[in-house]
UniProtKB/Swiss-Prot annotation:
GO molecular function: ATP binding; ATP hydrolysis activity; ATP-dependent DNA damage sensor activity; mismatched DNA binding
The keyword DNA damage is assigned to this record: yes
PROSITE patterns registered for this protein in UniProt: DNA_MISMATCH_REPAIR_1 (PS00058)
Name this protein carries in UniProt: DNA mismatch repair protein MutL
Biological source species: Crocosphaera subtropica (strain ATCC 51142 / BH68)
Family per similarity comment: Belongs to the DNA mismatch repair MutL/HexB family.
Encoding gene per record: mutL
InterPro entries tied to this protein: DNA_mismatch_repair_CS, DNA_mismatch_repair_MutL, DNA_mismatch_S5_2-like, HATPase_C_sf, MutL/Mlh/PMS, MutL/Mlh/Pms-like, MutL_C, MutL_C_dimsub
GO BP term, pick one: mismatch repair
Amino acid sequence: MSPPIQLLSPEIVNLIAAGEVIDSLAAVVRELVENAIDAEATRLTISIVPELWQVTVADNGRGMSLENLRHCAKAHHTSKICDLDDLWKITSLGFRGEALFSITQVGQLTIKSRDATGYQVGWCVDYNQQGEIIKEQTSPMASGTIVTASNLFGTIPVRRQGLPTIKQQLKAIQGMIDNMSLCHPQITWQVYHNHQSWLTISPGKTPQQILPQLLKSVHFHDLQFLCETIITPSQEQAKLEMVLGLPDRTSRGRLDWLKIAVNGRVVRSPRLEQTILAGLSRTLPKGRFPVSFLHFKIPPSEIDWNRHPAKTEIYLQSLEFWQEKVTEIIEKALKLSPLTITTVGQNQRVKKLLKASENKGVYNVGTSHVNELDLIKLRAVGQVNKTYIVAEHSQGLWLVEQHIAHERVLYEQLQDQWQLIPVEQAIILTQLSTKQVEQLERIGIDIEPFGENTWAVRNVPKLLENREDCPDALIELSLGGDLETAQVAVACRSAIRNGVLLDLAQMQDLLDSWKKTRNPRTCPHGRPIYLSLEESSLSRFFRRHWVIGKSHGI
């Protein structure tokens, strides 16, 4: 006979629920940090002692009164929602009233807090497994809250043994802090591991100032920050912020820094991630991935957070609308802007050029403030090695590689209009495999048998129409890839070759066309197209600030 179905005891129910919320040291840190941010803290101090299974989070937020301290660790007690309607108006990071109670189920909880609204003294409170106070006493302290969770998972040895290694848990904690610091750049973070300083993050006005502190290889001017105000389909106001690593300056070998946040929390959204990758398609070399942080600040009524205990999965209304806005903001970020046409990141290459003539001296190139009219007046003045166009503007000059600049122009033209035109005389190809024939048909080529191991092609991409190497280009197209790959191949083969002499008019035409492209920074293979040399950098190199003497007329 099967065992009878019984009602679980409250103790078992609570422990199961706690395991959904608190499953690691990182989860404890996450929940306490979210509470601190909800309390409007601007400074967080976190201490982790793995050997003691102890986490302490101190903040300078609003703090709690003794009355709130008596209820805050009880199950389903919260100040953030009151009724069912509030579930669709959530503006806080926490709202379920589960975190502190869940910590009491898996460890020992102590809270010190002082209400910021006029209380002269704080309170120190210890809790039992039911979230009830077992000890309370006054505690002199500044306004804010200090939460200590210790002996975590001590009553569940099987759970503790099944957790990742301490090293892995510390990595997870660092990743969580990285994410939260990007979402809340106004906060100062000080993190200790075994009482030794481990992480420090200074505050900033935007996440563009935070990201270089997290990725030491990335500089402030390697990044483009945009903030767009958007009217949603429900006619409410929202904001979309993006920090994008400019593809000609920084990238990653792994897809680990493509981050999406919604209303202060990093979330997983495969469809939005694919939208970002599609928007950055053909801007990075093969095997390289973008550095990107995208933050949606949208009305809470358009989000359902109540889908995952860690709130990392959400339902977002009008997802197609937001995908379109993401594509638009990426296009804007890739444009040549006044603040990013020359950079500290690019200057690493400039420094190598300038230092080739001397062993000492570092010439930093500052941020250019060339306005949009100056960009329009970019003027071709010469050609170097029949490869690089020398272009002058009011604050310096650029070196533009002619082949890949033209390749970018042609590629975007092909993207906008993939035009196949009939040819008067069929182009004969031989020794094609079945897969090659299928590939040509897949990209729209009209091909038919023309004898044994021979094929006749009746139409070709317009750019290849009058080229002598058109048969070779068709064979290249037959070797695989999607339509985008074919467009890149055609653009590359059709672009002006390096080693071709151009006159000033041809160079100027190319510069004008190149500046109008959606992504003038890199070619479709991900190579940088231009190098900027500021006049101020050249001036420092030639010591134009030196005072030699009046007799020299300087």
